[in-house]
Amino acid sequence: MLDERAKTLLKTLVERYIADGQPVGSRTLSRASGLELSPATIRNVMADLEELGLIASPHTSAGRIPTARGYRLFVDTMLTARPLDMARSEPGLAAAQEQLQPDQPQRVITHAAQVLSNLSQFVGVVTAPRKAGVFHHIEFMRLGERRVLVILVSPDGDVQNRVIFTARDHSPAELVEASNFINAHYSGLSIEAVRERLKTEIDALRGEIALLMQAAVQFGSEAADGENEQVVVSGERNLLTMQDFSSDMGSLRKLFDLFEQKTQLMRLLDVSSRAEGVRIYIGGESQIVPFEELSVVSAPYEVDGKIVGTLGVIGPTRMAYDRMIQIVDITSRLVTQALSQK
């Protein structure tokens, strides 16, 4: 447990380092903290903070910098919340409101990623709204012996095709009968609802219809998952100009791999979508994106009161967390508003 003197010095050190990007020495702390302490006393407190793992001393400087643990304590206990005033506290957000108007979902999330990147000067990320896979219309077409083309049409007109191999050959008439039966009894239901009904109804279905139905459900589920694994990334090139990364090609390479492959990023944003409000990961806290020099500020967004995706900012641990929280929070609200309007 830190006393008030240590808290003040840690808060001052973090704020100065975020602002200047340079290790903070005892003389700077003495001036900036407003505490009337001798240099020796400040050095003793700094030594205690370093022993607690809250600050560290770079080899090239006598000053100190915050560690991920120090940033976490700062964010959790010392951060002063800024007012959510788009016009006065963050003028760029007023312009963002003009960009994030009701539109096609893909355009909204693309604009949102750009807004996050432009305002933060870091990387903006937005996951596409999750869609519940729904059976609308299905057709089976014979391609050859034991080969069937499955054509799945979504409620919004998207068409997905897949070739499946069946246990026996089916005539065109059988395939038409199967598709007519499925469309008549299951159209309009979610993939999950169809899956649950099949558990109880499969014994009553004719063998060929049951097998084709199972293949259709599997295909529909995979198609829906594929649509939901979309993330828009904007501003990756901003990392090239940050002193925190620009001189470390190894870290840059790992970061660009993260943005290109997107699998880890999707997992992290999926976890974030289960939290209410803004969530902050500092350094390797998430264990999904284990970069000690990286922080993620994220928040879920909704459509008609239901969480359907996540957005956020990715940048160095040396970021102005109060400002990033505000940018992410308001952008989340604007996206929610844009997607919820009919």
From Swiss-Prot:
Family the UniProt entry places it in: Belongs to the HrcA family.
Name of the protein: Heat-inducible transcription repressor HrcA
GO molecular function: DNA binding
Keyword Transcription: yes
Superkingdom of origin organism: Bacteria
Entry-linked InterPro entries: GAF-like_dom_sf, HrcA, HrcA_C, WH-like_DNA-bd_sf, WH_DNA-bd_sf, WHTH_HrcA_DNA-bd, WHTH_transcript_rep_HrcA_IDD
Gene source species: Methylibium petroleiphilum (strain ATCC BAA-1232 / LMG 22953 / PM1)
Originating gene: hrcA
Sorted UniProt keywords: Repressor, Stress response, Transcription, Transcription regulation
